[in-house]
Curated annotation (Swiss-Prot):
This is Novel acetylcholine receptor chaperone. Residues 43-54 are annotated as: Interaction with NGFR. Molecular chaperone which mediates the proper assembly and functional expression of the nicotinic acetylcholine receptors (nAChRs) throughout the brain. Essential for the proper folding, assembly, function and surface trafficking of alpha-7 (CHRNA7), alpha-4-beta-2, alpha-3-beta-2 and alpha-3-beta-4 receptors. Stably associates with ribophorin-1 (RPN1) and ribophorin-2 (RPN2) (components of the oligosaccharyl transferase (OST) complex) and with calnexin (CANX), both of which are critical for NACHO-mediated effects on CHRNA7 assembly and function. It comes from Bos taurus. Its main location: membrane. It is a multi-pass membrane protein. One of its GO terms (molecular function) is acetylcholine receptor regulator activity. The gene is TMEM35A. Residues 136-177 are annotated as: Disordered.
């Protein structure tokens, strides 16, 4: 049976991957939703107007929208279907994209309800990346005393564990005044 951590990472990967494939497709084509597609076109025009540096670099709203949409679709497919390290790389790129989108929303002065989904999915991407990259639990490994920390009798090879602070603390009720 898979560990809860593995189930969580797989569930987040598939859900986030499908979401970004869907959102990227909406940016690329009106076939899924004409209203959402036209709204994306309008939003990306305002992003390019608010950031003149993009125009100076030769990036128009169509190129920006299609580039971000294609990157979302590609990373979403990787998040959904490809195992291992590429999934974490796609997660990282999507996280950078979400941060860029949040920046654009702030730049044009959009209200929170227009970009709340980006905040939520940014948090989910961060959680997925942290869970996936967290080292395995090492509670089964034996704890060893740090080097140079000899026991009271001077034996460096003393492997007895020191009691934790919790075990040393007095147990029972405390009087607070």
């Amino acid at each position: 049976m898979a560990s809860p951590r593995t189930v969580t990472v797989v569930a987040l990967s598939v859900a986030l991957g499908l979401f970004f494939v869907f959102m990227g497709t909406i940016k690329l084509t009106p076939r899924l939703s004409k209203d959402a597609y036209s709204e994306m076109k309008r939003a990306y025009k305002s992003y390019v107007r608010a950031l003149p540096l993009l125009k100076k670099m030769g990036i128009n709203s169509i190129l920006l929208r299609k580039s971000i949409g294609a990157l979302e679709v590609a990373c979403g497919i990787v998040m959904t279907l490809v195992p291992g390290r590429p999934k974490d790389v796609a997660n990282f790129f999507l996280l950078l994209l979400v941060l860029a989108v949040l920046f654009f929303h702030q730049l044009v002065g959009d209200p929170l309800k227009r970009y709340a989904h980006a905040l939520v999915f940014g948090i989910l991407l961060t959680c997925r990346l942290l869970i996936a990259r967290k080292p395995e639990d090492r509670s089964s490994e034996k704890k060893s005393s740090p080097p140079g920390n000899a026991g009271s009798d001077g034996n460096a090879g003393n492997t007895e564990e020191q009691p934790s602070l919790y075990e040393k603390a007095p147990q029972g009720k405390m009087k607070l005044s």
